[in-house]
A protein has these predicted regions:
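Glycine-rich FAD pyrophosphate-binding loop
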Residues: 29-53
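An anion/pyrophosphate-binding glycine-rich loop and adjacent beta-alpha core
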Residues: 42-44, 49-50, 58, 64-65, ...
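Short hydrophobic core segments
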Residues: 13-15, 38, 139, 159-175, ...
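A glycine-rich dinucleotide-binding beta-alpha-beta segment and adjacent secondary-structure elements
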Residues: 135-138, 311-391
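Core beta-strand elements of the Rossmann-like FAD/NAD(P) dinucleotide-binding domain
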Residues: 8-10, 154-163, 235-236
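N-terminal Rossmann-like FAD-binding beta1-loop-alpha1 element of flavoenzymes
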Residues: 10-37, 409, 413-414
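A conserved short coil-to-beta-strand element within the FAD-binding core of flavoproteins
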Residues: 135-148
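Glycine-rich active-site loop/strand segments that organize a redox cofactor
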Residues: 55-103
Length: 425
């Protein structure tokens, strides 16, 4: 049978100028393909600029196998992609294109500049060096015939292509242009979409205590996520933030990924003093009380707790805020200690998917070839990044997935060979 090896002359359209899309476009072009990158915002990498609080957690300084341990959804699907482009490979790539990197706590890798713009600059340099054409276009439809993709339709007209790589933004952070178009485009060609929900997302409290402490950030605290059966499904140590609706911050975002779909009754339990066991904490409280014997209880905790937290802890302890410290009983002191060591926040639900850093759900991975990222339903159609039903915890793992799947999709599309038309007759 005659084959038409396009040998790098494939015309490839990449839809979506985020992390995965830029990597896919650059890699395909570097392999010799003619690549057009379509980004409806006109400016690629908009969401990338706000990741990691504007610093961009590029990857994690770990073995690629350890990345899989931080992927709760479909980790086996990523085996080939990560084996081919590890965190070490990602670091080398960005260093090569002028973005110096450093590793911090938890092996999180950031640009030395502490600016996400440095990461974006490296990617843009990569695109320019490999002559990727960037166009500000919104794709309205994928064109296909005979089980093979033939291009895309945009609001400005059709663009023919041998291969199309879908790497669109998902539903999170709509202000950056993420509208979930990729789900619609993939579904129109027969792909199953696993319902998107927030994965790394803030949590909404049932009561109002968090709102009373809005803006308070706590560092070096221990967190446990407990389900309705009382089982601890996640625990970690780090930083959280009280908001007007509930809880946010790194440990909370990671905890949210462990909340099963459709399950209610979760509680976040916070140890406000994890470095102190109960005996040591009790001794600390006694020392503070000794120094404030004649004060009202509400005026005795400033050395132990943040100011905005004191009224909430007092209310939960059941101790009268105006009770004199020298009259507080051992049982009351015990109630205070238990409140500090297990500050519970019943969770009503996750915040809306629009508030999520990462979305769980997307194109069903059993319909995608894990070794190439090509659709099993439509020849010449590829997927990369968050559009796929894979997600990971915080720590640079989600961007590592974007780099790895984008690279694999780009190289696979550039190397794609098609049967010549006459063989079909």
């Amino acid at each position: 049978m005659n084959m038409t090896p396009l040998n790098g002359s494939n015309k490839i359209v990449v839809v979506g100028g985020g992390a995965a899309g830029m990597m896919a476009a650059g890699m395909a072009a570097q392999a010799g393909a003619h690549v057009t990158l379509l980004e409806q915002n006109g400016r690629p990498g908009k969401k990338l600029l706000i990741t990691g609080k504007g610093r961009c957690n590029v990857t994690n300084d770990c073995a690629w196998q350890d990345v899989l341990l931080n992927v709760p959804t479909n980790p086996r699907f990523l085996y080939s992609a990560l084996a081919g482009f590890s965190p070490a490979d990602a670091r080398a790539f960005f260093e090569q294109y002028g973005c110096a990197l450093k590793a911090e706590r938890g092996n999180r890798v950031f640009p030395v500049s502490d600016r996400s713009q440095s990461v974006l600059d490296a990617l843009v340099r990569f695109l320019h060096e490999n002559h990727v054409q960037l166009l500000p276009r919104r794709v309205t439809e994928l064109a296909a015939a005979g089980g093979r993709v033939t291009g895309v339709k945009t609001e400005s007209g059709p663009i023919p292509a041998d291969c199309v790589i879908l790497a669109t933004g998902v539903l999170s952070y709509p202000a950056t242009g993420s509208a979930g178009d990729g789900y619609r485009l993939a579904a129109a060609l027969g792909h199953t979409i696993v319902e998107p929900v927030g994965s790394l997302v803030p949590l909404v409290e049932k009561g109002h205590d968090c709102a009373r402490m809005q803006g308070l950030a706590l560092k070096n605290i221990a967190v446990r996520l407990v389900n309705a059966k009382g089982k601890t499904v996640y625990e970690d140590f780090g930083e959280l933030l009280f908001t007007h609706f509930g809880l946010s911050g790194p440990v909370i975002l990671s905890a949210s990924a462990h909340m099963a779909r459709g399950e209610d009754g979760y509680t976040v339990r916070i140890d406000l003093k994890p470095a102190l066991d109960e005996k040591t904490l009790d001794a600390r409280i006694l020392r503070d009380f000794s120094a404030a014997q004649n004060r009202d209880f509400e005026n005795s905790l400033s050395a132990l707790l943040p100011r905005s937290m004191i009224p909430v802890v007092i209310a939960r302890s059941g101790i009268d805020p105006l009770q004199k410290v020298n009259s507080i009983t051992k049982q009351q002191r015990r109630a205070l200690l238990e409140t500090i060591k297990c500050f519970s926040v019943p969770i009503a639900c996750k915040a809306p998917v629009e508030d999520a850093i990462v979305t769980s759900g997307g194109v069903k991975v059993s319909e995608v070839n894990a070794k190439t990222m090509e659709s099993k339903r439509v020849q010449g159609l590829y997927f990369a990044g968050e559009l796929l039903d894979v997600d990971a915890y915080t720590g640079g793992f989600n961007l590592q997935i974007a780099w790895a799947t984008g690279r694999l999709a780009g190289l696979s599309a550039a190397a794609k060979e098609f049967s010549s038309p006459e063989d079909a007759t």
